[in-house]
């Protein structure tokens, strides 16, 4: 009996990991261009290169082609599987562990489970976003460089070689250089800011989703439909994403290694927040909020839909 239960538990955990991984891959593929626009909008300082999300996507497509809108996607697609798998599986595991009765709603325990999931995921999230941001922002830096060169043709703030570096950065090269010069801590630059963003996000998202999803649970099946889970994931994701946008802006600014001419560098979260407030005003903390909502809503809607359909369970049954 014990062996049988252990086998079933192992199967359940594996299925949850597969569900989280598949959901992450599908979600990232669908919304990555909007995420790229969010990163570029959040990193703008002084004169804006892009007026908004649509303007950013149009200019990116014209200057860098369709594939330019997926710059950095390879990093995300590689690492989003373990990231989303850890996040969703950790929350599910902690909820079952902390809840006294599986059918009883307990907001405090749900928030604590969400907090635990947010902490677990940063092991993957921090280095993934560190590399992704450098690749996503390269196109904006190239535009800034060209504008500076046009304005001051006799004075070149960047060397000719740096142009190609901005346009053709490599995730492998960036990772190797960070490890060589700064060690493992280089890949975990902005870890504190990542925790400050992801823990509140998870505390808001998971309890909100669980309660919204519960509204659509069928008495016959004991589960919500795919459509309801998708809508609940979208709603909870968009609310959570907008709520933590100021922290996401700080994280993006801190993790960006290369800056344009005249752009600030930051020593940490407090220094970044102070400079952002004094030099760009309160509105700067909400840069990319619309993009974040458009990215996170379908990303988590798809994630929860796939998760509750149970694709992982069906895949594992094929190997039984």
From Swiss-Prot:
Q: Which UniProt keywords apply?
A: Membrane, Mitochondrion, Mitochondrion inner membrane, Phosphoprotein, Repeat, Symport, Transmembrane, Transmembrane helix, Transport
This protein's source sits in the domain of life called Eukaryota
Q: Which GO terms describe its cellular component?
A: mitochondrial inner membrane
Q: Positions of the Solcar repeats?
A: 11-97, 105-215, 224-313
Establish whether keyword Ligase is in the entry. no
Query: Phosphoserine: which positions carry it?
Result: 150
**Family in the record:** Belongs to the mitochondrial carrier (TC 2.A.29) family.
Q: What is this protein called?
A: Mitochondrial glutamate carrier 2
Organism in which the protein naturally occurs: Rattus norvegicus
């Amino acid at each position: 009996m014990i062996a049988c239960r252990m086998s079933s538990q192992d199967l359940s955990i594996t299925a949850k990991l597969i569900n989280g991984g598949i959901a992450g891959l599908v979600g990232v593929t669908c919304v990555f261009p909007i995420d790229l626009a969010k990163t570029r909008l959040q990193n703008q300082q002084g004169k804006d290169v892009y007026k908004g999300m649509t303007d950013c996507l149009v200019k990116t497509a014209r200057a860098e082609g369709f594939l330019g809108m997926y710059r950095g996607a390879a990093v995300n697609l590689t690492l989003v599987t373990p990231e989303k798998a850890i996040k969703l599986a950790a929350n599910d595991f902690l909820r079952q562990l902390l809840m006294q009765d599986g059918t009883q709603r307990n907001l405090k325990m749900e928030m604590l489970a969400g907090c635990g999931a947010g902490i677990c995921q940063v092991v993957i999230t921090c280095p993934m976003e560190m590399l992704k941001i450098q690749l996503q922002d390269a196109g904006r830096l190239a535009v800034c460089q060209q504008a500076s060169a046009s304005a001051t043709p006799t004075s070149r703030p960047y060397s000719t070689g740096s142009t190609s570096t901005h346009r053709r950065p490599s995730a492998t090269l960036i990772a190797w250089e960070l490890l060589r010069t700064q060690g493992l801590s280089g890949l975990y630059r902005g870890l504190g800011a990542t925790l400050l963003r992801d823990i509140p996000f998870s505390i808001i998202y998971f309890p909100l989703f669980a309660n919204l999803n519960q509204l659509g649970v069928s008495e016959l099946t004991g589960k919500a439909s795919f459509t309801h889970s998708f809508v609940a994931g979208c709603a909870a994701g968009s609310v959570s994403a907008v709520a933590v946008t100021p922290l996401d802006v700080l994280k993006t600014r801190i993790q960006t290694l290369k800056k344009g001419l005249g752009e600030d560098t930051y020593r940490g979260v407090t220094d970044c927040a102070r400079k952002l407030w004094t030099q760009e005003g309160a509105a700067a903390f909400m840069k990319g909020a619309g993009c974040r909502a458009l990215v996170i809503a379908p990303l988590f809607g798809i994630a929860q839909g796939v998760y509750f359909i149970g694709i992982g369970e069906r895949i594992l049954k094929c190997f039984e």
